[in-house]
Each structure stands twice: as structure tokens, then as C-alpha cells.
Amino acid sequence: MMIICSDNIATNMIIDYLGLDTINACIRELGFGHTVLHNPLHFDRYDKLGTTTPRDYAALFAQVAKGTLVSKEASAAMLGIFRQQHYNTMLTHDFPQFYLDCEETGEPELIWVASKSGSMNACRNDGGIIHTPYGEYVIVLMNKEFHDIIEYNDPPAMVYGARVSRMILDQILACEGKLYLK
């Protein structure tokens, strides 16, 4: 529930059960040195809920994709959960639907996404693994100072993120997955 539906009640139940210190120790042990959970997810009570960086977020998804986060089995289970996540609009909104939706044909999806989004106050974030016919890549989009109302269609942060995500996908597909940075 806490990943697929972004249910903060489920998240807070885990926080209450394990405790912030235990969770933060695990985060550090996994190597995410710039990520901290400051408080339970009560938006009306706390100004600072958590801190992370694009690098830590990308490293998390890279390890899940490689099967090296905790174990191969745990990574595979996490990947399955991230693939079911409901709120991936920032990553997929501008993707051609014929890549993502093969329910009518019964064929496997050409592109699938395993991601986790989040928003708080003026921050809009999404990150995950994009699987293409040419391989997988990790993308993380973190926006701040977007004082839009996310309840309406196409808020600016989502539109901006979707455009960036589509530009990256187009380059991956055009180069058949062979992108080289010099």
C-alpha cells in the first residue's frame, strides 16, 4: 500500500513499528548517506519529513535493477512492487501509449516503468527504472519551488518532468540504448 497507492498511513505504521532510528540506520547501512527520514509523514505537523538527493535515489533504483539491494530475491520483489505504483505521470505522461499498453494484443509491454513518486509542499519528485527493448536506465526527476495545485490535470511540475523524461526516452530509443557520455 505504501508504494503502490502512496498510502502514508501504511508508511506511518511501518515508521511507528520500526522507529526512525532503526530506519535511518538501515538507510545508512545500505549506503545512502544523503538520505534521512526526519519525521513520520504527517504533512500538517512537520515542516521537514525527509531528505534525499537525486544520486541516492538513483542508486537505490540502480541496485534494485541489478538485484543487489539486500538480495536478488528482495530486489525482484521490490521491482514488482515499483512496477505496480499508480502515480508515475511525471515519468510516463508523454510516452507513446502503444509502448506502454499491450493489454489488447496480449504482447509484452515494449516499455515498462518501475518507479516511486512523491510530493510535498512545493516539491514534486519521481524516479525509477525505465525498461526499453534496448535495456534499462534509471531516471530521477526532482523539482522544487513548484507552487501548483497537484489535484488538477497537468500541473506545471508534472508537465516539465514528463517532457524531460520523454526527451531521454527518445534519445535512448534513437541510439538503440547505446548512449555514451564523454
Predicted regions and their residues:
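Mid-domain, small-residue-enriched loop/turn segments at the edges of structured enzyme/sensor domains
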Residues: 12-69, 73
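Secretory-pathway/luminal and periplasmic proteins that interact with or process carbohydrate-rich
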Residues: 9-10, 34-38, 87-92
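Short, histidine-centered active-site or binding-site loop motifs used for metal coordination
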Residues: 6, 41, 143-145
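Membrane-embedded alpha-helical core segments of multi-pass
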Residues: 6-7, 19
